[in-house]
Amino acid sequence: GISGASRMGTKLAISDERYREALALIKAKDEGVAATMQLSRYLGLRNEEAVQAVKSIKTWKQAILRGDERVRVIFGTKGGRARDTRVVDKEKVLSAINEAILCAEKNNGKLIDMPSLQQALDRYINIMRRVGGLKYENSNHSLRYAYAQDAEKYYISKGFTQKEASALTSIDLGHGDGRGDYIKRV
């Protein structure tokens, strides 16, 4: 932000255990919110990207089945800039996509069946907070942080240096290049 205050350590990557616990609670309340949450966790999507992901899930599925290692995030991106995001865990991403496809078929072609994007976003955030308890250090943004950690580990396992892994992950998150030090604070 503009204040110049450090945001270091204000949010944490959600643990797998806490994620599964929240997901189970949320799934019981709203399957669409749960499906959206899974896409966010395994593709590092921002809230608006996750809510609008329904427009791309079939394309993403085809891309992954074709062997692509990235999917293109087009809708809901910051500044309308499309980006390619690394598929770190193919099985989990495909499972999340398949669940989202089934969900959309039951929900008038939407993941969260609300009249407007803003109402869908509000419902997504509210259910994650109230039902899943995802707030403070375990906010919904902690899903994106968890993806970032997975992506960084993936790149390091492929032989990239820590600095390269941070830069590549930064690009996956849609931060552009040259902001690699952001990831180290995740």
Regions found by a protein language model. Name each.
Residues 1-21, 78:
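Flexible interdomain linker/hinge and immediately adjacent N-terminus
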Residues 16-47:
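Basic, Lys/Arg- and aromatic-enriched nucleic-acid-binding interface segment
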Residues 28-32, 39, 136, 140-141, ...:
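Residue-level marker of regulatory loop/turn positions in helix-turn-helix DNA-binding domains and
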Residues 37, 48-53, 169:
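Alpha-helix N-cap/helix-start motif at helix boundaries, enriched for small hydrophobics
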Residues 38, 142-177:
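C-terminal catalytic core of tyrosine-transesterase DNA break-rejoin enzymes
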Residues 52-95:
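Conserved tyrosine-mediated DNA breakage-rejoining catalytic core shared by Y-recombinases
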Residues 58-61, 174-182:
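Short, basic interhelical loop/turn and adjoining N-cap
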Residues 88-153:
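Active-site/catalytic core of tyrosine-dependent DNA strand-transfer enzymes
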